[in-house]
Amino acid sequence: MAEKTTSTRYAVVTGGNKGIGYETCRQLASKGVVVVLTSRDEKKGIEAIERLKEESNFTDEHILFHQLDIMDPASISSLVNLIKTKFGRLDILINNAGISGVMVEGDVQVLKEILERYISIVFTEDENGEEGGWTKSGPGSVTNYELTKECIETNYYGAKRMTEAFIPLLQLSNSPRIVNVASSMGKLKLLCNKWAIEVLRDADSLTEEKVDQVVNEFLKDFTEKSTESKGWPSYFTAYKVSKASLIAYTRVLATKYPNFRINSVCPGYCKTDVNANTGSLTAGEGAESLVNLALLPNDGPSGLFFYRKEVTFF
């Protein structure tokens, strides 16, 4: 393993076995960062490490694997102990792991066509407070409470658990960085619920507890089958709520830890499992955005939401 020095940087990437996470691991390691690639599926994680070593001539000096379930505190604790023992600190935490909260039903091609139409609206700068004219769930995907809960637990609470667990090790770094992978689908204009929008928009009074309150209220409304009457978005609902909450949480963190550089980012509409590989960008192109924020200088921005490499509105 690489010698522990003040110049060597150590990174943890969640969901690193495929897609944007995989390419982020590759790019960071190529820049001299020692990377811990994590995934819930141990077999897939080990296979990913072997592919990276073969494709990029990496060794254990550059990259290693550790199994991680971000919904399991014991699993997170095991990773914290590994990082503490091997490196003594952490410099970069990239919360990349995420799921869509829906399940494909029927013809995947139908879902792809729906996503392409919908995303063309989502990825515009038209802040009109509407859901692009989308009023009902389209064909091609279904959701239920289990999928919705898992989406929130993974995309929001998973990132939150990881952050809280690694703050002590990040505080030992001279250049601590946290990158939360969000989405333009988490923009407030698509959240629709006016109360939630007002809570998350008020950056001056925003707290972690208020973000949690929005998430819990959404889950309560979903359980009571009142999301439509309460004005929550009708499509990819849990995904939007989870990503909006993550962007808001990033703001709270940046205020709480002013010596850190903490940002959220939409890597663009990339070909990934989450969108049935309908994206227009490659995973590698998406990963560039994450790496850019992970390697910010100490006087770089913090608490912002980026679309790829540019600051965008929330």
Curated annotation (Swiss-Prot):
Record-listed NADP(+) binding positions: 13-36
> Which residues are responsible for catalysis?
Y239 (proton acceptor)
Please give the tissue specificity annotation from the record for this chain: Expressed in flowers and red fruit tissues. Not detected in leaves, stems, roots or green fruits.
Here the disulfide bonds are none
pH dependence statement: Optimum pH is 9.0 for the forward reaction and 7.5 for the reverse reaction.
- Does the keyword Nucleotide-binding feature in the UniProt annotation? no
Q: Which UniProt keywords apply?
A: NADP, Oxidoreductase, Plant defense
Assembly and interaction partners: Monomer.
Q: Which family does it belong to?
A: Belongs to the short-chain dehydrogenases/reductases (SDR) family.
- PANTHER family with a match to the protein in the record: (+)-NEOMENTHOL DEHYDROGENASE, (+)-NEOMENTHOL DEHYDROGENASE-LIKE
Q: What is this protein called?
A: (+)-neomenthol dehydrogenase
Originating organism: Capsicum annuum (Capsicum pepper)
Instruction: List the top taxonomic levels of the source.
Output: Eukaryota, Viridiplantae, Streptophyta, Embryophyta, Tracheophyta
